[in-house]
Amino acid sequence: MAISSDAEFYVVIGKAVSKAIDEVIERIFVEMQQEIEREVYSAGSSGDYDRTNMLTEAWKHEARGLFGDIEFQPSMLPANPSAFQHDSPYGWDVRGIIFDILEGGYRAYNAKTGKFIAPRPWWDNFLAKVDSKIDKWVRAALRRQGLVVI
């Protein structure tokens, strides 16, 4: 395809880059879900509560033009105060800070046993993984859109 103006160049390149960004955002989202599964849900359980396994789904992710966004949506987590799932009968809704609790560790969930829930640094691990692979993912996505990337 011959491009004869700056406007055509930006339209053609913009579409290709936008599609590539869609692909990369989706890839990052899947990697994040896998990291949560590995670092949070596969890290063992106190047995004192039933997991909802919703931390992997409580996210809005979208690509908009030439950038993308992945945002935690605490309201997507179910709150079951009687079962102490993300809330309590005493009004301690922790959905908005659940990842801070996981990152830093927490004692309250194991108040019966006195055992501390160890920190789970899933976020740092996830960022390190993305940092190590993002260039490769972007180049591959751009190539799939027909762009030659050096």
Predicted regions, residues:
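Short, Lys/Arg-rich flexible segments
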Residues: M1-L77, V94-I150
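Short, surface-exposed beta-strand/loop "edge" segments at domain boundaries and coil↔beta transitions
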Residues: M76-V94
